[in-house]
Swiss-Prot record:
Keywords: Cell projection, Coiled coil, Cytoplasm, Cytoplasmic vesicle, Cytoskeleton, Metal-binding, Phosphoprotein, Repeat, Synapse, Transferase, Ubl conjugation, Ubl conjugation pathway, Zinc, Zinc-finger
Domain Fibronectin type-III: 440-535
Residue list for modification Phosphoserine: S44, S46, S49, S53
Protein name: E3 ubiquitin-protein ligase TRIM9
SMART domains: BBC, BBOX, FN3, RING, SPRY
CDD domains: Bbox1_TRIM9_C-I, Bbox2_TRIM9_C-I, FN3, RING-HC_TRIM9, SPRY_PRY_TRIM67_9
Annotated binding of Zn(2+) 1, by residue: C168, C171, C193, H198
Encoding gene per record: Trim9
Domain of life: Eukaryota
Summary of subunit composition and partner proteins: Interacts with SNAP25.
Pathway: Protein modification; protein ubiquitination
A single Gene Ontology CC term: synaptic vesicle
Binding of Zn(2+) 2, residues: C229, H232, C252, H258
Amino acid sequence: MEEMEEELKCPVCGSFYREPIILPCSHNLCQACARNILVQTPESESPQSRRASGSGVSDYDYLDLDKMSLYSEADSGYGSYGGFASAPTTPCQKSPNGVRVFPPAMPPPPTHLSPALAPVPRNSCITCPQCHRSLILDDRGLRGFPKNRVLEGVIDRYQQSKAAALKCQLCEKAPKEATVMCEQCDVFYCDPCRLRCHPPRGPLAKHRLVPPAQGRVSRRLSPRKVSTCTDHELENHSMYCVQCKMPVCYQCLEEGKHSSHEVKALGAMWKLHKSQLSQALNGLSDRAKEAKEFLVQLRTMVQQIQENSVEFEACLVAQCDALIDALNRRKAQLLARVNKEHEHKLKVVRDQISHCTVKLRQTTGLMEYCLEVIKENDPSGFLQISDALIRRVHLTEDQWGKGTLTPRMTTDFDLSLDNSPLLQSIHQLDFVQVKASSPVPATPILQLEECCTHNNSATLSWKQPPLSTVAADGYILELDDGSGGQFREVYVGKETMCTVDGLHFNSTYNARVKAFNKTGVSPYSKTLVLQTSEVAWFAFDPGSAHSDIIFSNDNLTVTCSSYDDRVVLGKTGFSKGVHYWELTIDRYDNHPDPAFGVARIDVMKDMMLGKDDKAWAMYVDNNRSWFMHNNSHTNRTEGGITKGATIGVLLDLNRKTLTFFVNNEQQGPIAFENVEGLFFPAVSLNRNVQVTLHTGLPVPDFYSSRASIA
């Protein structure tokens, strides 16, 4: 919580925000501080006069204004809350933090109201103290900026957790400790401000003044004020404008500038932005965790450098002492070089520790602040700051990348003393710098969210650990045989993603990966278990088909442009398991005899399926069918096909059999036995036939029952 305090303090006064308002650039200011840094612009630079000169622009949001006109001399400077001035760097009186500070244009009225509520001079300009964007106020003045109720709630909870003394809300300079609180005005006063702004007379005499602690409790228990529309102060926010990214009321939708914009429900957008902020925080939290581990690593490096330095110096002294008196003259010089290298390494590491510590503290503070903001139940107030917080979180997360978490210095001393020269060559003795042997790479991490299987293919992805400093020259991916057997290499290369095809269906595979470089190989990663699909989904393969084959229906339907038989294969091959697919006859003219079955990848494509020794098929006409392999015709069976008929093909590689079905009835005996190897579904047909393929089908129930009995 302490690191969040920077998020809760005004950049102008340095104190906790009091009645904060939100500028169009998403930064916050105390309302009183905003009045103190107002600048009155000449009449000729007002938005009205600039629009009259013909150089005005339409109502852009502040990001577009920033891009288009922040440094443009012809910019009108008019926006939805006002506009950015065209010359934000105009020199004028400045506070220590570079913010332009001018005294109020008129003294605050001697009333019990805050000076920030007094009228704002016409043609006033305000510069954000953080991004230094200048903004010309419209007729509403500071009332045109929404109040940050969420930030007020976070500050109140923070002060309660710290038991901080409540400060006066009306002190113009350093706020004094409050002595009372007015329950009606909801304002904390010190004694001088109470006497000046809240005298016990007139209508104020009836107000109830209580101790600050009691007032804090009553304020916490009382319902928080609902945020109202800046354009229609009597209306509460009811919807969210997607284009302008801001809450709006119903009057804005009916008659205001949001009437033609896309709007969404306030509650739905509140939940959506909370979800987006939470997701962004998850990424930033991971970065912060890595940063903490990185700092531990850096601090360990300091100790290792100290230890290695001591060890190296001792070795150096021992070698120098062995080279008699002549070595003593060089010993001092060599020790000086070692110490210089030692100090250089320490300086680099300590500088990096300091830099990362500051960045981590800022990151932690932003995280704690965002977590407190998420606890708020004010949708309107939350949506006013959520976009800016989400951008800050993403920006902070990005800043932790780009090599930030990589050590700038190694712990080893890349020096080696060569003590072989003769005594008369001692004056030439010097360090010989050698490259230290590089360690093996760290163990790769399999990225489970990117690993998947499809049909009989598996895609695996991996990465190096985030804190690894040793580069890998490549990776070796290994899979077992799907039956718990030995692992075998399936990929060797530099890529961190690989797709393995041709696996068995309905099988479980174990995968692992290791990295290698010139020094050696890393340990294996954790083993990942992959399950391939139980049934196959596939289509016909245009790449391997005869050129006369015509494809349609996403390659599930085929016919032919020739009167001769032509062969087309399926995209998926089978070498293990039980597989079943069907083909429906969409068109059947002039009683042709198409063939259905399986084939090797190199089957002849310009003749009927089964005429060579690379295919096993059943060809059928309108009356009967035959089985055919290597041009041998067997098992003539009565019963043919017509339009609408269904051909089923059952390939059982566990029992090494091929069986055919016509209209859900087995056609003849088992067609072929002792079939083994890699088979592709296959069809041969001519222009008189059109068939459609149906895949992903379970094995017929009667066959499953018969197989279990057998």
